[in-house]
Amino acid sequence: MAVLFIMCPVSSFARDDDEDIYELSLDENLATPEIKNDKQADRIQEFQYDMAIAFKKSNYAVEVMRDDEVIVITIPASQLFDPNDTVVNSVGEALLKPFLRMLKNPGFYKMLLVMHSDNTGSSVYTLNLTRQRVNAIYDWFDENGSVDYVVPYALGDTDPVVDENNNIVENNSVENRKRNRRLEIFLVPEKTMLQQAKKGTINMSHIAKDK
């Protein structure tokens, strides 16, 4: 069985049904919607674990968090963009394409796009670079599918990788800086998945397959 790295849980946050997800912080969006029913949570955890394994078998770097309810896929920025560029390249497009089917059933997933940089350059530069890059990825999803329930975040160099030993990966080598330049895609269960889990079965057929 493939082993997935477990990330630390996020703080609890209660979201109103009419809350605008685009007005929420990253932590707030990661914490909601909250799943309070144990049986419902069990079904979602099982479904998400299977999805995570499928991504891992396709050679994506995968983690799970929030009691296995949220999937995190990390893609190196070097596989999405040419150096210092803000246009998604052909390799990046191929890596992003599998996520289009996650968006074909609005409300099944909330997808959070979180772009990071190393600390090369000023904080203003790194923030602007990550903002342009995450907006380019958001626009790519908009042009090729849908951006309903897709929320972009640009964090500059403020959130370096934390490794499996809970150590911060410092920007003190070429390899470490490369690790910190990354896109994190969080797949958070949303209302449609929660409704299916409440009824008893989460059915992948509700997400249309690519032709």
Language model: regions and residue ranges:
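N-terminal targeting leaders that direct proteins to extracytoplasmic destinations
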Residues: 1-70, 190-196, 200-211
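A broad, low-specificity signal for short, low-complexity segments enriched in glycine/proline
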Residues: 23-26, 32-37, 71-74, 110-114, ...
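Second-shell loop/turn segments in exported
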Residues: 34-41, 79-89, 123-127
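Extracytoplasmic/secreted proteins, especially bacterial periplasmic and envelope-associated proteins
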Residues: 39-42, 46, 50, 91-98, ...
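Periplasmic peptidoglycan-binding/anchoring modules of Gram-negative envelope and division proteins
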Residues: 50-59, 63-65, 81-114, 185
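Soluble periplasmic/extracytoplasmic beta-strand elements of cell-envelope proteins
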Residues: 63, 70-76, 80, 110-114, ...
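Solvent-exposed coil/turn segments that connect beta secondary-structure elements
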Residues: 67-69, 76-78, 86, 101, ...
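Periplasmic OmpA-like peptidoglycan-binding domain that tethers envelope proteins to the cell wall
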Residues: 117-203, 207-210
